[in-house]
Amino acid sequence: MVAPGLVLGLVLPLILWADRSAGIGFRFASYINNDMVLQKEPAGAVIWGFGTPGATVTVTLRQGQETIMKKVTSVKAHSDTWMVVLDPMKPGGPFEVMAQQTLEKINFTLRVHDVLFGDVWLCSGQSNMQMTVLQIFNATRELSNTAAYQSVRILSVSPIQAEQELEDLVAVDLQWSKPTSENLGHGYFKYMSAVCWLFGRHLYDTLQYPIGLIASSWGGTPIEAWSSGRSLKACGVPKQGSIPYDSVTGPSKHSVLWNAMIHPLCNMTLKGVVWYQGESNINYNTDLYNCTFPALIEDWRETFHRGSQGQTERFFPFGLVQLSSDLSKKSSDDGFPQIRWHQTADFGYVPNPKMPNTFMAVAMDLCDRDSPFGSIHPRDKQTVAYRLHLGARALAYGEKNLTFEGPLPEKIELLAHKGLLNLTYYQQIQVQKKDNKIFEISCCSDHRCKWLPASMNTVSTQSLTLAIDSCHGTVVALRYAWTTWPCEYKQCPLYHPSSALPAPPFIAFITDQGPGHQSNVAK
């Protein structure tokens, strides 16, 4: 995959120069095509493209013989682009979009057919987002189940790098299409993203109207490649330095994927974004991830809002997958638990004050020892997508009384005189499997601290106690599941009883050692 990106990176300036010298010609943006999904109400969908400076462009939306609306604009001289914002449309279709350029009484007409209105989601990240349906559990069954989802349309962006922000995509691996077993299972780590497809399928089952899915991902890539220079500067990310060879296998240069694979989409009206990335930062700028990730979210939101003429919500819903596990990393390595924590901006949960309107799928219990693609690529993407869609239903669609996150303590009470810590959760808890090592306390004595296991003592429906009598000093902190491989497949100790959502990892500091001291951890 690197070679094509390098080749295209070399010829790209020549291609763009040749097009511009010829006036670029009259065309839609690269991703406006037959079978596409445009964002439904309350937002207006953006239609744009390139043309001859000074020409008038009329965009017509038709359904059968009926004209639904017309919008008129002109081609901007400085960019050779034109753009219109359609009136908000109810979900449904199909429609035809026609664009006509008029200059000195000469007309050129473009048409795209079978256009639907629904919700458009962008899916991005590295290889776990890039894994195709062909690579997951029960692939044959999943690939045969496409006929019922012809209103879920898919598009996959080609892996391309660029030194500067591009206005339009250079290439598309899969143009807007109806799902088939062929385009959903097109090889390994190509197209279409399994997480993206399964997430969209769950949304369609719930919403019963069209869903558009855009996959733009590249394996082995750090967050710096997906971030604009603005957001990296805001976090004080140092200029390109050495990168551990085992952390990054794809493009790593700052902003090159933002420039070529995300920025060209920013004129599009979106419903939201789903993100699965972080493995390539476990040994690279790890300590900055609690800034670079929230900064990426903020920058993408601002850029898409501005690019779509204010049609994409300023704080559109942003979903993330918290990292799973990897057998190749030592259990003592801190990279995986650190990134999991930083994925929440060090709150342990989302949404939070630094990451508003976000939702998260915990995946640390979906480990896969026997994955032929390496344990870092677990094959159970169905559960990932299911957990993601619960968050989307709650945050993006406002569904009430829906459990979409696992239990997290809201209070920790130190009972030092009894040798206990008491944890009170804001949700009900269920002990799936007792593990006396997954909770750890930081025990300090003579200015030296070490982490010791704290075994589970008693458990009730919403609280548990931990034995801390192994600490002969001062207990200053508590952490849960702070390891690369916390448990076997769906066998972590704590889950929500009815939703089967795992308790997420956390770390909490205990600052007061008085009897009965309480520390707030979550919400």
UniProtKB/Swiss-Prot annotation:
<dbReference type="GO" id="GO:0005764">
    <property type="term" value="C:lysosome"/>
</dbReference>
<dbReference type="Pfam" id="PF03629">
    <property type="entry name" value="SASA"/>
</dbReference>
<keyword id="KW-0963">Cytoplasm</keyword>
<dbReference type="InterPro" id="IPR005181">
    <property type="entry name" value="SASA"/>
</dbReference>
<keyword id="KW-0732">Signal</keyword>
<dbReference type="GO" id="GO:0106330">
    <property type="term" value="F:sialate 9-O-acetylesterase activity"/>
</dbReference>
<dbReference type="GO" id="GO:0002682">
    <property type="term" value="P:regulation of immune system process"/>
</dbReference>
<keyword id="KW-0458">Lysosome</keyword>
<dbReference type="GO" id="GO:0005975">
    <property type="term" value="P:carbohydrate metabolic process"/>
</dbReference>
<feature type="glycosylation site" description="N-linked (GlcNAc...) asparagine">
    <location>
        <position position="401"/>
    </location>
</feature>
<dbReference type="InterPro" id="IPR036514">
    <property type="entry name" value="SGNH_hydro_sf"/>
</dbReference>
<feature type="glycosylation site" description="N-linked (GlcNAc...) asparagine">
    <location>
        <position position="290"/>
    </location>
</feature>
<feature type="signal peptide">
    <location>
        <begin position="1"/>
        <end position="23"/>
    </location>
</feature>
<dbReference type="InterPro" id="IPR039329">
    <property type="entry name" value="SIAE"/>
</dbReference>
<feature type="glycosylation site" description="N-linked (GlcNAc...) asparagine">
    <location>
        <position position="138"/>
    </location>
</feature>
<protein>
    <recommendedName>
        <fullName>Sialate O-acetylesterase</fullName>
        <ecNumber>3.1.1.53</ecNumber>
    </recommendedName>
</protein>
<keyword id="KW-0378">Hydrolase</keyword>
<feature type="glycosylation site" description="N-linked (GlcNAc...) asparagine">
    <location>
        <position position="267"/>
    </location>
</feature>
<keyword id="KW-0325">Glycoprotein</keyword>
<feature type="glycosylation site" description="N-linked (GlcNAc...) asparagine">
    <location>
        <position position="422"/>
    </location>
</feature>
<feature type="glycosylation site" description="N-linked (GlcNAc...) asparagine">
    <location>
        <position position="107"/>
    </location>
</feature>
<keyword id="KW-0719">Serine esterase</keyword>
<dbReference type="GO" id="GO:0070062">
    <property type="term" value="C:extracellular exosome"/>
</dbReference>
<comment type="function">
    <text>Catalyzes the removal of O-acetyl ester groups from position 9 of the free diacetylated sialate N-acetyl-9-O-acetylneuraminate (Neu5,9Ac2) in the cytosol and of the diacetylated sialate residues of sialylglycoconjugates in the lysosomes. Together with the sialate-O-acetyltransferase they regulate the balance of acetylated sialoglycoconjugates, key players in various processes such as cell-cell interactions, host-pathogen recognition, and tumor antigenicity.</text>
</comment>
<keyword id="KW-0225">Disease variant</keyword>
<dbReference type="GO" id="GO:0005615">
    <property type="term" value="C:extracellular space"/>
</dbReference>
<dbReference type="GO" id="GO:0001681">
    <property type="term" value="F:sialate O-acetylesterase activity"/>
</dbReference>
